[in-house]
Amino acid sequence: IVPGVVLLNYVCAAVRREAGEGVHCSGFPSVKFLAPLQPGVAFAIALDFGAGGRVRFVCKTEDRTIAQGSMQIETAAGVEQ
């Protein structure tokens, strides 16, 4: 089973690809792991950027949601707008 921290690392990497390399993940106020992910199974990450540096995310395999939650992002200058 892929550890939850590895999934969250993938979520952070997806956010950096979308928002830019100067952004970093500063916290996860809410995370729910709903199903295990087996190594080698493909999954997709959907992101929804909100106000105040809050990003909602959903991780899904072909047939189920495996994790969802929200994270806080910041730049070197502070919270993302």
Regions found by a protein language model. Give the residues of each.
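Aromatic-residue detector
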Residues: 2, 28-30, 57
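Hot-dog-fold acyl-thioester-processing enzymes
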Residues: 1-18, 80-81
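Generic ordered-secondary-structure signal
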Residues: 7, 17-18, 26-27, 64, ...
